[in-house]
Amino acid sequence: MRYKQNETLLLKYLGPSPVLRITDFFLDNPLSDFSKNEIVKNLEMGRATFFKYWTELEKSGAVIVTRRIGRATMYKLDRENEVVKHLVKLDMALARRAMEKASEQYKKPITVKSR
């Protein structure tokens, strides 16, 4: 499940800042929770960079603890957080727009030949 920078619509639209990359990773995996090590590995982000911005996400309430497995703490996005709700809406709007643009390419007029 390697994660490539700039491959999502949200990152293409808003830019690949570390906070957005972390948030986007959770948006793309809404049913899963992850440890910090799993996030760093999947994002291929430096640990120093990750922890610099992770603290901001925790303080803002954007990420929450879901459970503990041994020494690992698992996290997910707090879908009740107001900022997260807006990011989800933006992500959905970007996806809808991209689908509409893609479907326009396949709409071709039908020509009927008369006999």
Give, region by region, the residue ranges found by the protein language model.
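Short, hydrophobic-biased segments on the C-terminal half of alpha helices
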Residues: 54-56
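Short helix-capping/hinge SLiMs at alpha-helix to coil transitions
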Residues: 13, 27-31
